[in-house]
Amino acid sequence: MNEKATELDLVNTHFVSPHGLDDDEHYTTAYDLAVLTNYALNNDKFKEIVGIKTTTITVGDYSRTITNTNELLGNTEGIYGVKTGFTANAGRCLVTACKRDNLDIIIVVLGADTKEIRGLDTVNIINYVYSNFEMVDTYNMISEAFENYKETQNINVTKSLEEPQIRLSNNFTYIYPININEVKNLKTSIYTISRIRCKY
């Protein structure tokens, strides 16, 4: 577990046990939990399991129905996981994954006094994000910048110290969540290499 934490660059996380009971050497942060959750959700089986609200386990003649302790699962639009937690020191904790309008978010609430507060804080954050942010595809902005870009200076390099690696490409796209009020302020700039090493 600690090897995986190092691999994911979870610098504020250290595991002592898989059950997570209180220990001075067992700790993490909301950010690290979000990174870990994002990684785990790439595993289809994990994603399936954390999204199950109830299931029945049958062994022989014995059956038992178990219910997910995530009270928001199935009761709040877009939520598809992930995990509740509680210890005396940690308080009520909840890591939540939600998707609305093609925007996936992960919310981490730690140290709540009650399950109700934990759930309310999570829902409030989710509603804030989806009310104030939207996904913006910058492809058209970048393409327009490249179309309008004009080279203003030619440089002749007769004896370069190494093969020049100069490339200008608009064959890419970026999609970001951006505050709705800031979308109109987006600008695209192209910066050229300011110095090329060569000998005369």
Report the location of each language-model feature.
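Domain-terminus/edge residues, biased toward the C-terminal soluble/receptor-binding domains
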Residues: 10-11, 25-200
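Asparagine-centered polar/low-complexity signal
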Residues: 2, 17, 68-70
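Short, charged, amphipathic alpha-helices and their helix-cap/turn boundaries
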Residues: 1-13
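Surface-exposed aromatic
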Residues: 13-23
